[in-house]
């Protein structure tokens, strides 16, 4: 963000809205998980959005994180090296994003490289890391480190199987959208305009 001037008007309002979505409590949970999950010592940043961004900005921590979710020798990011060059840092971030997508994160849940590198949308970075953690817990392959309660529980598939007889019986049931054949009916009523028969 050093090369960008201040935002004004609508751009400023949009940026402020995005910045309000950032969760400081979630930041602490993510830092705790990342330091636990990484096999190497990746350090620990001071609290704050900018410190969190600077910690993740060069991509080495993210690459160590995604490698920690795979067994030894099957790491998706082979070469991790700290660099001060902008393009090297962005390349490592994009390697993490590609590996996260292969791991199973939806493309719509993944942040853009500039969201992290320029600090444009750190809330989106948090959401991606939360989805990654939740998916790692749901996989239950023994490679997740940390407390599973840090992440929302993913729903599991619960298929229903019906026999042919059950499916055939279902065709005989009148759906409630069609009305019902029980309860009040017009049985015993006289037609319109006819006199009532009182006996």
From Swiss-Prot:
Gene Ontology molecular function: actin filament binding
Per UniProt, residues of the Calponin-homology (CH) domain are 24-136
Coiled coil, from the record: none
Query: N-acetylalanine modification sites?
Result: 2
Q: Which residues carry this modification: Phosphoserine?
A: 11, 163
Chain positions found as Phosphothreonine: 180
Q: Which CDD domains does the record match to this protein?
A: CH_TAGLN2 (cd21280)
Q: Which UniProt keywords apply?
A: Acetylation, Isopeptide bond, Methylation, Phosphoprotein, Ubl conjugation
Pfam families (UniProt xref): Calponin, CH
Residues with the modification Omega-N-methylarginine, per the entry, are: 182, 196
Cellular component GO terms, alphabetically? Answer: actin cytoskeleton
Please list the disulfide bridges: none
Instruction: Point out residues bearing the modification N6-acetyllysine.
Output: 17, 20
Annotated cross-link Glycyl lysine isopeptide (Lys-Gly) (interchain with G-Cter in SUMO2) - which positions?
Answer: 171
Biological process, per Gene Ontology: actin filament organization
Query: SUPFAM superfamilies given for it?
Result: Calponin-homology domain, CH-domain (SSF47576)
Calponin-like repeats: from-to residues: 174-199
Q: Family per UniProt?
A: Belongs to the calponin family.
Protein name per its UniProtKB record: Transgelin-2
Q: Give the source species.
A: Bos taurus (Bovine)
Primary gene name: TAGLN2
């Amino acid at each position: 963000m050093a090369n960008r001037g201040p935002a004004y008007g609508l751009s400023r309002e949009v940026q402020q809205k995005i910045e309000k979505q950032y969760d400081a409590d979630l930041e602490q949970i993510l830092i705790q998980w990342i330091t636990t999950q990484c096999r190497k010592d990746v350090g620990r940043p001071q609290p704050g959005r900018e410190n969190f961004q600077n910690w993740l900005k060069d991509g080495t921590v993210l690459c160590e994180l995604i490698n920690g979710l795979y067994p030894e020798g099957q790491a998706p990011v082979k070469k991790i090296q700290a660099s001060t060059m902008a393009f090297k840092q962005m390349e490592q971030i994009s390697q993490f994003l590609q590996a996260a997508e292969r791991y199973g994160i939806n493309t719509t849940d993944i942040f853009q490289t500039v969201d992290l590198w320029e600090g444009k949308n750190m809330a989106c970075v948090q959401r991606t890391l939360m989805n990654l953690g939740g998916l790692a817990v749901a996989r239950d392959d023994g490679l997740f480190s940390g407390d599973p309660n840090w992440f929302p529980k993913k729903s599991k598939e619960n298929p229903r199987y019906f026999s042919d007889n059950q499916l055939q019986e279902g065709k005989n049931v009148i759906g409630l959208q069609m009305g019902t054949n029980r309860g009040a009916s017009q049985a015993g009523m006289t037609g319109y305009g006819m006199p009532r028969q009182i006996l």
